[in-house]
Amino acid sequence: LGNVLDRDGELRLLDFDDCMIGPAVQDLWLALGGRDAATTELRENFLESYEQFRRFDRTELRLIEPLRGLRMAHYAAWLARRWHDPIFPRNWPHFGTEESWERETIDLEEQAIVVARVERGGSIAPPAAAEDEEALTNKDLFWDWDG
């Protein structure tokens, strides 16, 4: 994290200009966005400390995956809007290539599946191969799907 400094053995947080512009969980998941057990434990420890100062609505945790998908799309748009700046093609030479859009599409499709799974009360982890989970349809992935 670029906004956490270690000074004399103490962690100091700074740069809160993008904080508190959405649900509290948005600030949390950006700092602790992993899906693994270690991140889940860190997130829980953070929340226990956080709640010593302010209440946290844990039902907001279900927003992590939709916010992750939104962030993915927003990041691609952010790069595209700044592509005229010469520093961007130098630092993101893969952006805008057929391969990058293919990867972006696959990532967003996978994220949509995770969001739908969590919305139905499931885990962020894919089901075990032996499980016979009902297949997702376009209606699960697109709110305005009529077909």
Question: Residue spans of the language-model regions?
Answer:
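ATP/Mg2+ or Mg2+-diphosphate-binding catalytic cores
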Residues: W78-G147
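Hydrophobic/basic alpha-helical segments enriched in Actinobacteria
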Residues: L1, L5-L14, I21-G22, A37-E44, ...
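Residue-level detector of functional hotspots within protein domains
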Residues: L14, Y50, I64
